[in-house]
Amino acid sequence: MTIALGRFTKEENDLFDIMDDWLRRDRFVFVGWSGLLLFPCAYFALGGWFTGTTFVTSWYTHGLASSYLEGCNFLTAAVSTPANSLAHSLLLLWGPEAQGDFTRWCQLGGLWTFVALHGAFGLIGFMLRQFELARSVQLRPYNAIAFSGPIAVFVSVFLIYPLGQSGWFFAPSFGVAAIFRFILFFQGFHNWTLNPFHMMGVAGVLGAALLCAIHGATVENTLFEDGDGANTFRAFNPTQAEETYSMVTANRFWSQIFGVAFSNKRWLHFFMLFVPVTGLWMSALGVVGLALNLRAYDFVSQEIRAAEDPEFETFYTKNILLNEGIRAWMAAQDQPHENLIFPEEVLPRGNAL
């Protein structure tokens, strides 16, 4: 019996090996397998947005001007959502709505679905890029896990929320002022600021900003060797091989300030990862709830008493009145296709009036 020892080697590389070698080659801008998803999707999403904000009107979908060509600026231009009558159509260029007519496709809001879907897959491609590079250089995948937070928010706000409503029309349009309008809509129709998931999201994002500022300041404060530079600017040398700040000193400082402090770098940095990512995920879950029209806190007893007693008001009841005002004033302008008309006497007024 013959026993062959050694490793099996293929005489010729197949197509997969050739592609793998080219895609993962060390170059200035890494491509990778994830790049096959990331780069085309990012290119089309950004290209669609620039095209829409430059040339495409929203007259046929919202009755609005939304492009530089019509006189908008960077803050007021937008790629607007399709009309409510188009419901959840993917609005493919070759679909039954546009039938291959590019101009008609733009007028119907096809660029919005184009940008939203390519944007979502572009973000997913960027997360996969972080996974791929982490594996290549033998890192843990925490960067990719952290980036799942922004992806969850994007998908929940731009895709899941309108899927739960009557159509893409109720998603945010892609523009600065358009996003502000969407925030006002969320407050008026969902009382979003009183939603506990929104509260957790705010705590996560602002808490992360606070942690970031404290951490950066503490590291700068506890440097014991800036480098061997003769002046301040050469001393902040980013190529130093070793850490030159004192965790012990930082621990002693914050122990005196708060009575407690991080004594372990891994726990400290994991906490800085955990706070914002958890906040983003919680806010995304809250938006999924809004897609199903789940309500925030309702303090009905205060509303009943405020209705019965003109002298009783709380900040909550005032906000509820403001929400009613947003709904009444906004709906007629925001949904012109409904032909809503509210007589003056039904528009909400505060107790003081």
Curated annotation (Swiss-Prot):
Annotated chlorophyll a ChlzD2 binding sites: H118
Family listed: Belongs to the reaction center PufL/M/PsbA/D family.
Taxonomic lineage from the root: Eukaryota, Viridiplantae, Streptophyta, Embryophyta, Tracheophyta
Protein's UniProt keywords contain Signal: no
Protein name per the record: Photosystem II D2 protein
Note: 2 of the reaction center chlorophylls (ChlD1 and ChlD2) are entirely coordinated by water.
InterPro entries: D1/D2, Photo_II_D1/D2_sf, Photo_RC_L/M, Photo_RC_L/M_CS, PSII_PsbD/D2
PROSITE patterns referenced in this protein's UniProt entry, alphabetically: REACTION_CENTER
